[in-house]
Amino acid sequence: MKKLVSIAALLLIIASFSLFIYRPAKETIIFFPIHPHVTFSEAKTTLQLQPQKRDGKYSLLWSAASSLDRDAYLRQDISLLFADGRLVDRLAKWKTNSQTLTQEKIVAARDSRFFQAISFHHGELHEGEMITSSQTMTSDYLYVIDSPYSPLVSFHRAATQDEKEWQNVLNKTTAEFLQHTSESLLSHFSIQKQQYYSLYLPDLIVYNEQPLPDLSMEKTQEIIGKLWEGLYKSYFLGIKKEDGSILSPIGSTTPLILISKDYSHLLVLTETKDGEKIRLTQQISR
């Protein structure tokens, strides 16, 4: 009997230890120093309008895929889809000991809209005791015209006069909405915008290929990697308020990214579907 109790106790200790060291991959993206020789051989995000409408709604095929040039200890991809300045949906996938991830989703919508998707592709690499990472971003956008006066159509770049007019209308509507929301957020939190480099999350894609002002590409990638680490934890999985409660990000405004010009910190501002103003703060290591 004593022997059985001892074995049970030992198993409990082992189980407890296993729980302690286990890191749930789906709940974390962690930035590690960028591996200088590991790259993504392929990465893409795509938005495609499907030909048939159903119950008055059209469908978008939204996909995100990436392939690293070697197996990674942990592969993770996340993607965010915005329409007219608000978050519509999320995609996420992770896999251990893998190179490639592919995911897609059909999203139903109605009315004419401007869709923007941005994805973060990440690989965590273990070589002995050294842990490094590889990362990249991809994006896509799509204008969908759903009008009772014309056939359902979509385009990336306007080719006809009608498409150009619709593109201007949708761009203006989205820009004015985000400008109004941003001004309200900046005023609410008493933030001096001139002290920051500012951009909306989908525009972060430009820093795939160029550094932030007065920074090296290496430091830029570190800031971007840690920004996505924070976004995944505190926005993608649920907006974490100061009181500890969690709100769904669906319906929230496109995050405004504010990077302090002295590179001491960055802010992420958004407004939830219910109108609650949110500020996320992240310190930048020197």
State what each model feature region is:
Residues 1-49:
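Gram-positive cell-envelope targeting signals
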Residues 39-79, 173-185, 189:
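Short, surface-exposed binding/anchoring microloops in extracellular/periplasmic proteins
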Residues 55, 66-69, 80-85, 109-111, ...:
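Beta-strand elements of well-folded, non-transmembrane domains
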Residues 85-100, 228-241:
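Solvent-exposed serine/threonine-rich low-complexity stretches and specific carbohydrate-binding patches
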Residues 99-110:
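Exposed aromatic-hydrophobic patches
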Residues 111-116, 120-135, 273-276:
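Short acidic/polar inter-strand loop motif in beta-rich domains
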Residues 128-166:
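Short beta-strand elements
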Residues 171-263:
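Intrinsically disordered, low-complexity segments enriched in Gly and acidic/Ser/Thr residues
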